[in-house]
Regions:
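Soluble "head" domains of membrane/secretory-pathway proteins
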Residues: 2-8, 23, 27, 32, ...
């Protein structure tokens, strides 16, 4: 026999479960999937990770579909240089990118002969390996691996193509309330070096 109360109770349960799931994903933690090789060797294609949503406070991008429920960012905590951060790319304010934070507001970032400079100071690095291979798209390429250390002591491994030309760039001056991000797979990453597609990332675009 058709039980109307049973359907109502199940609908309520599903509704409450949906509200709880949205709350957890918006306020506490959210799963993300790594779709590209731009963060290799530290994050691999297909890796799944959970991202803290409260680390840097909250903006509209903390919530599904980025609803304009308030402006700016609340409970803001400044991210640290070297943090791996998920953000909405400024090009469309929809696509999630995950990169390493290199430049803080006011910093000057530059590449000279594939060596990273922050505020005119070369970033210390040790060569970790001459014989690594890494993916760029669906191709496997030979790379040099380096252990880089940022001014605040944050360390990570970064890789550069062996047969790539030296990277030389203009100086990127990070605007107020913005950040500069790089992929660890330096020759296979679309990041803040590409001003038309990513560029500087405003603090309101940080997800976690």
């Amino acid at each position: 026999m058709f039980n109307k109360n049973f359907l109502i109770e199940n609908a309520k349960t599903l509704f409450y479960a949906l509200i709880i799931a949205i709350f957890i994903r918006s306020i506490i933690i959210q799963p993300f999937y790594i779709p590209s090789s731009s963060m290799e060797p530290n994050l691999l294609v297909g890796d799944r990770l959970f991202v803290s949503k409260y680390s840097f406070g909250y903006s509209k991008h903390s919530f599904p579909f980025s609803p304009p429920i308030f402006k700016g960012r609340i409970f803001f905590n400044e991210p640290k240089r070297g943090d791996v951060v998920v953000f909405k790319t400024p090009a469309d304010n929809r696509t999630d990118y995950i990169k390493r934070l290199i430049g803080l507001p006011g910093d000057k970032i530059q590449f000279i002969n594939s060596e990273l400079y922050i505020n005119n100071n070369i970033i210390f690095r040790n060569k970790a390996s001459n014989n690594d291979k890494i993916f760029c798209g669906n191709k496997r390429v030979d790379v040099f691996s380096f252990k880089e250390r940022l001014p605040n002591g944050s360390e990570y491994k970064a890789v550069y193509f062996k047969n790539g030309s030296f990277q030389n760039s203009d100086i990127f001056t990070v605007p107020e309330d913005n950040y500069f991000f790089l992929g660890d797979n330096r020759d296979c990453s679309k990041d803040s070096r590409f001003l038309s597609s990513v560029g500087y990332v405003h603090k309101d675009n940080l997800v976690g």
